[in-house]
Amino acid sequence: MATPLCQPAASHFIDGTFIEDRTGPEILSVNPVDGEIIAKLHGATSCIIEKAIASAKRAQKEWARKEPAERGRVLSRAADIMRARNRELSVLETRDTGKPISETLVADAASGADCLEYFGAIAATLSGDSIQFGEDWVYTRREPLGVCLGIGAWNYPIQIAAWKAAPALACGNAMIFKPSEVTPLSALKLAEILTEAGLPPGVFNIVQGAGDVGAELATHPAIAKVSLTGSVKTGARVASAAMAGIRPVTMELGGKSALIVFDDADVEAAVSGAILGNFYSAGQICSNGTRVFLQRGIREAFLARLLARVAALKIGDPMDEETDIGPLVSAAHRNRVATYVARAEVEGAYQMAPPRKLPPGDAWHEPVVFTNVTDWMTLAREEVFGPVMAVLDFDDEQDVVARANATDFGLAAGIFTRDLVRAHRLAAELEAGTVWINAYNLTPAGMAFGGIKRSGIGRENGRVAIDHYTQLKSVFVSMQT
């Protein structure tokens, strides 16, 4: 039998080397374009999990003792290697996820490299405080947590792995990372790159598997902290398991974000933001602004330009750099999205975008724009995670803020207006962890990212991420003797 196109050396990466255990359940990595099996792996058994834990515990202490600047240099070298191999990594990500190569070349490994570089630079600046109390004084030490667990999602596999690994390793922790079983491949490449950059064996380990593997890891007494990117349902389950052992968690979960367009907005910029916030990665982005609120005075011009640009989006082979929209990650996920579309029509929403001819295969879905959407419709309340935009009308500022906040989610929001006083006023009033003004879905490594309400706990990226991967120790020094 021929070796699958993207077959890794083995399923797991532990203690600086690839490890296989074929007794674990089979995991098939499938190219969603045509259903081709591109890799066959095996989920972790309890034996594999214990090997990863033992390796990480052993390596973490020595890694933490290294000078922070030395840890930073390893991360910086890894960033350089990732950039040098950006095309190779992007091709792998496109085959595993179905996302267009035009996206993966600029937004996946590249973003991961930026994060490694950012935290590589921060590592040498980690410090505590000194406080005087008369002649006595207190100083604080910022210490690593120990062995951290990262659990990834299938939409940005290598980016998420790097976003979790970079701050953890910069602070002197070890990390065990479990990729999504749907897209298991690129995290293994990150582990190889970190090792090549000089990361000691065991500091970053990869174990494969489904939710049962994540649950076993999250409840393991050796795990000091859990960071997960995924659905609200999965996040609640993992957070509950972690908190049973009094472990801190960082959760980046789902969203139903509002993108608000005022009458005075630049139409072209607002349409660009809405397209980016609904159809990039075929809509499979947690922070997408899928509730597009249009003030009535701009509605007609906005929709006319939007529909013209949506009609021009190229759907096709994701390896073609001219392609704008590829398949969804799987046929099963495509069917889930189609169910939401059908339900929206039953509930009275009107589909504006004309039907498109789709390539052969079971994972494709055309971009959809719904108008006549009301706040009570399922489409306006639940996360679809596909190329489906809901357009809602509004009259005034107070009305739209109240409606934008009327959701269990709080990941992100966008505001398009020329009135920056109004924009800053709304940014303060909107219940969201991230607000973009006259832009959307831009996430530089130096910007903290995360949600409130049911969209998550804690933040990824930015200097604040250091707080989530360290613990403070206070040392009181008496000068009375």
UniProtKB/Swiss-Prot annotation:
Coiled coil: none
InterPro entries in alphabetical order: Ald_DH/histidinol_DH, Ald_DH_C, Ald_DH_CS_CYS, Ald_DH_CS_GLU, Ald_DH_N, Aldehyde_DH_dom, BADH
EC number of the protein: 1.2.1.8
Superkingdom field: Bacteria
Residues bearing PTM Cysteine sulfenic acid (-SOH): C286
Cofactor note as given: Binds 2 potassium ions per subunit.
Record's catalysed reaction(s): betaine aldehyde + NAD(+) + H2O = glycine betaine + NADH + 2 H(+)
Pathway listed: Amine and polyamine biosynthesis; betaine biosynthesis via choline pathway; betaine from betaine aldehyde: step 1/1
Active site: K164 (charge relay system), E252 (proton acceptor), C286 (nucleophile), E460 (charge relay system)
Residues the entry annotates as binding K(+) 2: I246, K453, G456
Positions with a binding annotation for NAD(+): G152, A153, W154, K178, P179, S180, E181, S231, V232, K233, T234, G254, C286, E383
HAMAP family xrefs: BADH
Assembly mode: Dimer of dimers.
Known role: Involved in the biosynthesis of the osmoprotectant glycine betaine. Catalyzes the irreversible oxidation of betaine aldehyde to the corresponding acid.
Similarity comment: family membership: Belongs to the aldehyde dehydrogenase family.
Name of the protein described by the UniProt record: Betaine aldehyde dehydrogenase 2
The species this protein was found in: Rhizobium meliloti (strain 1021)
Biological classification of the source: Bacteria, Pseudomonadati, Pseudomonadota, Alphaproteobacteria, Hyphomicrobiales
